[in-house]
Regions:
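ER/secretory pathway lumenal C-terminal domains and tails of membrane proteins involved
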Residues: 1-266
Length: 267
């Protein structure tokens, strides 16, 4: 007890006297450490911007924490106050846009839960709502949009999901080539370059995971293989260049090899 912080002691007292008449909710921003939840990770229900303590055990699944009540979360999403993200002429700072991932995650998890229980109409409804209120053409964050890729496919709008995935992959390659073209004095931006293979893997995984949910593992495998083709092509072109340059000049191509190889990690 002596080593406990006051907030831990307060939480212990709340839990000791908890009678389930009023809910205990944990902020989405505070779940990064299990200690903050008193290691109750498996007894949570995802309610959008918070997690509610419930007497139902739900082990973490593919990185998603907590159970989802499809109808409850659908109502939460429908009652969101979205702000003014849909106005393309309005600029928001990073603090405001950081909430976008929570909005889209709510839509994704609600949409998947609805679709899996057979209510694909409601799933598509909130997907369209999210696109209307937070247009992907302006807010093209890969982390949050990749979750919507999965939801589109599971909800029966496969073409829209694949189109979004392909656009994200093209944008990632475009950004990758841009950062790679910068001179050495911009080394501080190398972190952005290293993010791109990870982002690419998120998109590919989003599609393959959707097919897995639908029992179409072969389609998921084929998509992964096809997504590796542009990477293999880039790698093959570099190898051919090296063979033509000879031993001495080939050392100048080593950075290109490392950049291409970094993408192979998504397998």
């Amino acid at each position: 007890i002596r080593d406990r912080f006051k907030n831990n002691l307060i939480m212990m007292d709340i839990l000791a006297n908890f009678d389930w008449k009023r809910s205990i909710n944990f902020s989405s921003g505070g779940i990064y450490d299990s200690e903050n939840l008193f290691y109750l990770n498996d007894y949570l229900q995802y309610d959008g911007f918070s997690y509610r303590l419930v007497p139902i055990k739900t082990p973490e699944n593919n990185g998603d924490m907590g159970r989802v009540d499809a109808e409850d979360l659908y109502k939460v999403v429908k009652n969101y106050r979205w702000g003014n993200f849909k106005d393309l002429n309005t600029h928001f700072d990073e603090t405001c846009t950081s909430n976008i991932i929570s909005y889209r995650t709510s839509v994704s998890r609600a949409g998947i839960a609805l679709a899996l229980k057979g209510d694909k109409m409601k799933a598509k409804e909130i997907l369209n709502l999210a696109e209307k209120e937070i247009p992907s053409q302006k807010y093209n964050d890969v982390r949050s949009l990749s979750s919507l890729v999965t939801t589109y496919i599971v909800a029966g709008d496969e073409q829209k999901g694949l189109q979004l995935a392909n656009k994200l992959k093209k944008d990632i390659f475009k950004d990758y080539q841009y950062f790679k073209s910068l001179s050495p004095k911009y080394r501080l931006l190398s972190g952005e370059l290293k993010k791109k293979p990870y982002e690419y893997s998120l998109v590919v995984e989003a599609v393959s995971e959707a097919y897995k949910m639908l029992g179409r593992k072969d389609d998921g495998y084929q998509y992964v293989v096809k997504s590796l083709e542009p990477i293999d092509k880039q790698y093959d072109n570099i190898i051919k260049d090296i063979q033509q340059l000879g031993k001495e000049k080939s050392y100048m191509k080593m950075d290109d090899i490392q950049n291409a190889v970094s993408y192979t990690h998504l397998t």
